[in-house]
Amino acid sequence: MLHVAPNRFVFLLLLSLLIGPLWAVDEGVLDQTAEVTDPTEARPLIHAHAHNDYNHERPLFDALRNGFCSVEADVFLIDGDLLVGHSLAELNGERTLESLYLDPLLDRVRENGGHVFSDGSDFTLLVDIKSDGDETYVVLDKMLAKYEEMLTRVKEGKVQKHAVTVIISGNRAWERIALDPTRYAGVDGRLSDLTSNRPDHLMPLISDQWNLAFEWNGQGPMPDAEQAELRRIVHEARTHGRRVRFWATPDQPSPERTAVWSELLAAGVDHIGTDDLNGLSAFLLSQMGATRDARITVNSVSTW
């Protein structure tokens, strides 16, 4: 039987009443730490892109738990910092690019042997600039330099591949970025850039709005001409060493959404975007003959 001196017992009792049990742990902190260090992880889904990822209950972590290899964050330059949100009205000084994405990614990479996923799958952070492109890039570039140990970068035209690839979308400061002798980010092109002679390390991705290129929205079979055009776009991008992404595809659970996702996957589109993490994860795993709880390793194609 454990004996405790009366005075010490009273002290411990009062202390526990004031601050809670000595062994109590903040569940939120414990849960987030587990996300960073847990050796068991979801199967990496190289085609899965989390559109407006910051809208989820736990930005970044919900996407990682579902195996997403690409996430998107909209940013505004406010008083020298990059705040994350879709509009000025929803910005919060505590929700920054560093706090929501760069810091937790760096923690995970350090804990995971230099990778976001243990199998080494490429991970993309798409930064959609909503404020002035040039002014925001200057701040973003300095910020990214602090995280260079995990970031793919280009020095004097030579690519140094690392765990996380940053791509800038939205208001893109093309000239300033292109002239930067050391870059920690590439730039998101458009379909009009498909045959551009810009190097793939400067423009590693081609993205555009789905209904600007296609009329088909998942109802009935995809017309042969549009199916051929989709494959042509992917082939042309591959020829120039670039990846492909479309935004604003159907995203409400429906046969139409499944039909569009199926065509994107069959054509080899690299990033399939969604707000429905569970839905896209389940779809991609079903195409791979796996379950949502699979804990297996897959190989991925190395990209810039």
Pin down the residues of each PLM region.
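Bacterial N-terminal signal peptides
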Residues: 10-21
